[in-house]
Amino acid sequence: MPSIKAVAKPALSLEEKLGQKLMLDFRYFCEQGTGKHCRTPMTKLPESLARVISDYNIGGVILFSENTQSIEQTITLSHQLQVAASKSSSKLPLFISIDQEGGRVARLPRDVATSFTGNMSIGATYKQHGVDFATKSATVIANELTALGINVNYAPTIDVNMNPDNPVINVRSFGENPQRVSELGAAQVAGFESNGIITSLKHFPGHGDTHVDSHTGLPNVAHSKS
């Protein structure tokens, strides 16, 4: 991906700035419409969506498993997305993002990307190995993502496991010790970012002490800011 300084305009208009705030989900696409009945995975960029990206200076996209069926196909899709962004008035490259945590949450096919056992198992190795496996797993994931043209990963998960009834975080957490979770999370951030991947730590303000899955309901975190 070219550097932003090399391609960007000196100043962006209000419309361009607004477009840069948007990150779109193109999980499915049907030429006849993209309503609830459309379940055709978008694996290549249609011209109509390419125009949306270029005409509205879209800042980023998020890829899901529907968009990533093979190595060659994903590389081609990433290239098509960046070509569309290069035709925008701002000339800014896209943030191409994904959820590839390295455990249960993985959007890349198992035969395309390296599978890991997840953060809880990394946390279990802390006493003997420190942050070693956190760094190494992030490095492997980062190298695979950059090879596919992806530059943002919604990871690591730094929620602290505090609720045994939590239906959505559980094994995605490094554990129940806040200090250990922070050390392992920082190690993964370093592993990702030193290999070209922008990280997005999650989940704010904390999903480790809830009994509701935020994908299906509204969790309540009953803690003070302190």
Which residues does each PLM region occupy?
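Metal-dependent enolase-superfamily TIM-barrel catalytic cores that perform enediolate-based chemistry
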Residues: 183-187, 191-195, 201
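Extracellular/periplasmic catalytic domains that process cell-envelope and extracellular macromolecules
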Residues: 14-18, 53-55, 88-91, 192-194
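Short polybasic/polar patches that bind polyanions
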Residues: 10, 146, 193
